[in-house]
Amino acid sequence: NSSAGHPSAMGDGQRMMARHGADMVGMGEATHTLSKIPQETTIRSMHVNAACNRYWSEQGWHNDHRGSMIHKQPMQIAWCIFDDNIRAAAGDAEDDAIQCTADTIEKLAEMCALDPRALADAVARYNGYCAEGVDLEYAKDPEFLIPIEKAPFHAIRLRYVWMSNGGAHIDPEAHVLDPDGNVIEGLFAAGACANGHKSNMFYPGTGLDMALGVL
C-alpha cells in the first residue's frame, strides 16, 4: 500500500517484503497531491502564488499534478480566488473550505497576506481573458473562464500533502525479487505495494489490474 492519508495505509506490505529480503524500488520517492479541495470551485477560479502571479490553467488532469504545481511555487504558497457567483454555483458543500471572505479584492488580499494592488491587477487581467473567452497565459478552456466580479470575494489556501511511493521489485509473474534479481520463493506482490515506478510526475496506474489478475 502507499500512504495517502488513510489510517490503514502504513506500508505494511512493503515492510513485510523488506523483512524477507525483497529488493525495494523507489522508496525515496514521494508524490505531492492536492489536499481535499472542491474541484467545482478550483477549476472555475483563479490560482495565484505568494507574488499574486497566476501559475497555471487551474484545470490539472489529476490531483497529483495539481499538488506538484503548488510545490513548485515560492514557499509553496498558493491561493484559490473566486467570487460569490462561483461559490453559489458549487453549493453549500464548498463553504467549509473557504478561509477568507471580503467585500473587495484588496481587502481579500490583506486577509491572505498578499499584496492588494498585485492581486487586484491579477484579477483584472484574468477577468479580461474571461471577457474575451481566450486565456492568453495558459489557454484555459473557455468553459471554465468565469469572471471574478461579484462581491463578496473568497479565497481558499491551496495545500498539498505527501503521498509516499515505492514498492517491491517483481517479475512479470509477480514473484518478488531480491537485490540480485532472484525470485524469493513463495512471495508474490501486486498492486501499490509493488508499484516502485510511481513517482512525483509519473503515474503508471498503480498496478491494480495486476492485483486482480493474480487473484
Where are these regions (language model features)?
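A conserved FAD-binding loop/helix module that cradles the flavin
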Residues: 2-15, 194-215
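An anion/pyrophosphate-binding glycine-rich loop and adjacent beta-alpha core
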Residues: 14-16, 20-118
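Glycine-rich, flexible loop/turn motifs
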Residues: 43-44, 51, 77, 134, ...
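A glycine-rich dinucleotide-binding beta-alpha-beta segment and adjacent secondary-structure elements
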Residues: 118-197
